[in-house]
Amino acid sequence: MDKLPCNELNQVRKAPHAAIGPVLIEALPYIRKFEGKTFVIKYGGAAMKDACLKNSFAQNVTLLRKVGIRIVLVHGGGDAITKTAEKLGITSRFLHGRRVTDKEMISVIQMTLAGKVNQDIVQLISEHGGKAVGVTGLDADTIKALPHPNAETLGLVGEVEQINTAYIDLLCRAGLIPVIAPIGFDDKGNVYNINADDAASSIAIALKAEKLIYVSDVEGIHVGERILKTICKTEAADFIEQGIISGGMIPKVLSAFKTLDSGVGKIHLIDGKATHSLLLEIFTHEGVGTQFIAEQDSDQSQNR
């Protein structure tokens, strides 16, 4: 057996066989339940930077596809864009959390996301036995975009107008994992920088996905020291009113429920800094993050 590339990944080998077996068996009903379903995964944050976490994520995605789950991966890459711009002597500017994007910057974004970040992800998945294909929003009209309402100040920042679901579905039916860089275009040929969270949400809605999973740098929704396993719309409204959910988490929560209202089955927020968090969230009863559900009932709250 080849040595695993990370000490963290080797810890599982130290556990008694009797402890590992039940964890594997616990996954069985979820594998049956989700076979043939579509999961859209937004990949970003620390999980894209650390070599061990990148390996873990690629393994997780490959395993999900191998057990029959259709995976559509949408990635970010903000730090990589900033570093590339710096090397080229271009200063990055941000307004309300959005990257100000002129023609020079959109070229950097295309070069970095499509030419480097996207292909690195595809290669890593392939190394673990998966079949991934790199896609940008420009390919086969995958993402048609409109200018952002604040285009006068943000420049070539866009919002999703339309998703080519037929093309994505074609790739999934061929057994491939589409790895999508969030770049879009309009009828005039303008290319737009699109927020990866927004792109993932739009793709999940268009595909009527079973799940939209955000792999991020937060463990989930915190209430005090506790991470909520499940949250419904009513609870979220109460927590926002009480100030328990505040700051930058408010738009994320509201966006999650808007996506749910548009037909996506469940939304999950998980910590990409935790090894194998994706598998643990999907294939165990407890999960490791927070799942957003449309209605609170015993069946939904106890199942991933």
From Swiss-Prot:
The reaction(s) this protein catalyses: N-acetyl-L-glutamate + ATP = N-acetyl-L-glutamyl 5-phosphate + ADP
Localization: Cytoplasm
Ligand binding (substrate): 77-78, 99, 193
E.C. numbers: 2.7.2.8
Site, Transition state stabilizer: residue positions: 42, 252
GO MF entries: acetylglutamate kinase activity; ATP binding
Keywords: Amino-acid biosynthesis, Arginine biosynthesis, ATP-binding, Cytoplasm, Kinase, Nucleotide-binding, Transferase
InterPro entries: AceGlu_kinase-like_sf, AcgluKinase_fam, ArgB, Asp/Glu/Uridylate_kinase, Glu/AcGlu_kinase, NAGK-C
Keyword Cytoplasm belongs to the record: yes
CDD domains: AAK_NAGK-C
BP terms from Gene Ontology: arginine biosynthetic process via ornithine; L-arginine biosynthetic process
SUPFAM superfamilies named among the record's database cross-references: Carbamate kinase-like (SSF53633)
Broad EC category: transferase
Primary role: Catalyzes the ATP-dependent phosphorylation of N-acetyl-L-glutamate.
Family: Belongs to the acetylglutamate kinase family. ArgB subfamily.
NCBIfam families documented for this protein: argB (TIGR00761)
Identification of the protein by name: Acetylglutamate kinase
Organism: Pelodictyon phaeoclathratiforme (strain DSM 5477 / BU-1)
